[in-house]
Amino acid sequence: MPRTARNNNMRSNGASIEVAGVIGTGASKTRKKMRDIERLLKKDTLPAHVRVENERALKALGVELQNTQHNLKAKQNAKKYHMVRFFEKKKAIRKLKQARKTLEDTASTEVRKDIKKARKVVKHSEVDIIYVMLFPKTEKYISLYPNPKEDDKTELSKNPKAKKGMQMTEERKRELRKQAERLLDENKLPFSIDDVLQGKTIRLDDTQNHAVLTEEIDAPSKKYNDEEEKEDDFFE
């Protein structure tokens, strides 16, 4: 085999190896590799098998970039909304404990109407906890217990755009609460509510949809790798 042909084959065969070396290195390097491949694909003289190989590599890198951006956004939101979720979780736990105590006391009276009402309050409180625990980390956190000020109400009445934004926020909150309630009704929660009430720290693995008893909301906020954040500055 002529040396030139052999070298061409080596370069084409090495494309997948080069892509593998980019996986997990961050969004900046992934985007750079994608631009390199896109420039290569613009060449009219590119052999068919090399073109196919690089088109596949480009698609794979596109998926990798999406995953990297998703994880980065989740990390940033976890840090940004750590305290508000921490306090709302504590408040939701307190409300559920009170609701369960009320149900227990009401059950002893044997008044069916009161018992039914108490059960609804318990379920509502359980949904609150699920909402806080499973709120998508890639989204801006929507508070369960907001404290609207008079100035805010006045601003909403004067600003149609702000009012529409608030309506969309409330709609999203209702949607997420319905999802939480559905998981509760279908017994598909990735964690135990009793574990939450007992103070066990739960880290949720979003990719695998299961829970691991380790640090999560209750853990102190950690400092993230500055170099990684500087490199992956897509959301800054």
Curated annotation (Swiss-Prot):
Residues 148-158 have a biased composition (Basic and acidic residues). Involved in rRNA processing. Residues 146-176, 204-236 are annotated as: Disordered. One of its GO terms (biological process) is maturation of SSU-rRNA from tricistronic rRNA transcript (SSU-rRNA, 5.8S rRNA, LSU-rRNA). The keyword Coiled coil applies. Belongs to the EFG1 family. It is found in: Nucleus, Nucleolus. GO terms for cellular component: nucleolus; preribosome, small subunit precursor. InterPro entries: Efg1 (IPR019310), EFG1_rRNA-proc (IPR050786). The gene is EFG1. This is rRNA-processing protein EFG1. Keywords: Coiled coil, Nucleus, rRNA processing. Residues 53-110, 161-189 form a coiled coil. Residues 226-236 have a biased composition (Acidic residues). The keyword Nucleus applies.
